[in-house]
């Protein structure tokens, strides 16, 4: 029997494409991703937030250092640049980020992941893809 839910706009009911069991497989995957994310920061729950996910993901996607003012905007759920700077400063203090002078503009600073953090994230994303493929296979079998 197909379950019903509201459409994305919240109006009309729609049939679900996947079963409760398949949805549960997805939730197991997201829990696994969260636990793995926490291991990147050696269990430090201060870094278990969407703010750091946004920041680290964007910095990982940029192979070259980015202006600190640009990095402030990576944390989409934080509206205050001052507050975003506090998060960045905490990551610098923990040794996850490198801040250096911008050789092209003395008024700005550049941010990048430390080599160790980049390697941790490389491994994290690699293991997620493996787990995602395994989860997809389990979902297909249902």
How would you label these PLM feature ranges?
Residues 65-75:
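Short acidic, hydrophobic short linear motifs in intrinsically disordered regions
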